[in-house]
């Protein structure tokens, strides 16, 4: 299992991005969380096998219909075994 911290930039707050990414993560069985940041970005913590993470990262660029993603930055992170689902914070 791998873990990454992701920051998504663009017109992504107030358009259902976190709910959309949760639905996508749940379908792929990705564990982690999503939260709005004060700078208008959305922060994600994702953990799953690397192929699944890469699939979800591709989806991060799409977002829901009303979103407009400008950038997706990733950073490797430590797996957190206590996270057993995907939550919106």
Please name every model-derived segment.
Residues 1-89:
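Intrinsically disordered, low-complexity, mixed-charge
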């Amino acid at each position: 299992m791998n873990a990454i911290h992701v920051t998504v930039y663009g017109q992504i707050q107030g358009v259902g991005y976190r709910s959309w990414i949760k639905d996508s993560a749940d379908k792929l069985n990705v564990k982690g969380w999503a939260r709005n940041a004060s700078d208008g970005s959305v922060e994600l913590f994702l953990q799953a096998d690397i192929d699944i993470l890469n699939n979800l990262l591709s989806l991060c660029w799409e977002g829901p219909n009303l979103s407009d993603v400008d950038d997706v930055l990733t950073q490797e992170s430590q797996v957190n075994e206590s996270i057993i689902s995907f939550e919106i914070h």
